[in-house]
Amino acid sequence: PMGREIKVQVNESKTQNKKPFFLLAPVGANSKSPTSLPVYSLYEMSFAKQKYTDIVIEIDNIKHKPDTFPIPIECSKNYLTRYSADTFNVDWNTNFTGKLYPLIPSINNTVSDKGINYELDKKNNHYEIKCIHASNHKHKINVKFCPAIPDIICLKQGIELDGNFSITTDNAKGNIKGYYRIEKKENDICLEIKSNKGWTPNEKRWILKILFYFVKVFQEWPKTYLWNAKISLNDTTNLYMHSEWKRI
């Protein structure tokens, strides 16, 4: 079947005197069946000023008006339309069903696989994951666990472990925080991750603090994301995992 025809045209006649800022794009706010936690970072982000911007939106030849922003920013009325020429998009912990393969740590307690780097703690000859990070030529994402995620194969029967995690990009502009939970049930390891504290921006400008206070979707959409996984330990040399995200 053919998809819908979408036409978008934006003409901005004046861009001077803007004070861009960082924003975690709320792309996940409307997803009903997420396949990951979308950590999409917009650097040097700006809103489009109504006075100097013409926007045309057509879907199946039907024109739509762009949403406007409820409060003025930089003494101007703005469209909710936002853009950035510097983005860093990470789909974290995508849904997965299949076998898990072992990774061999180096002597400095790190391991890399498919562009993802793991920092480990070694306790009683068992490795624990304390940090995961990845980067492109310009930006970097960090996922930290406190306490570190233990060696799941060696967990005692019936044990339940709780911890916290935080996600930051470039260690500066804000963070996503939440909890993780691990439980061993017979021959299965059950894991749960929820970003229940949402996104906390790190902005000092008062107008941005007001913006994030009144437009709550920017901070709160991650709170609705829940990840569950089950890892089968029937054969410790041939681990199998099924994991998925859902909105709650």
What do these predicted ranges mean?
Residues 1-248:
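Structured soluble/peripheral alpha/beta segments that form catalytic or ligand/cofactor-binding pockets
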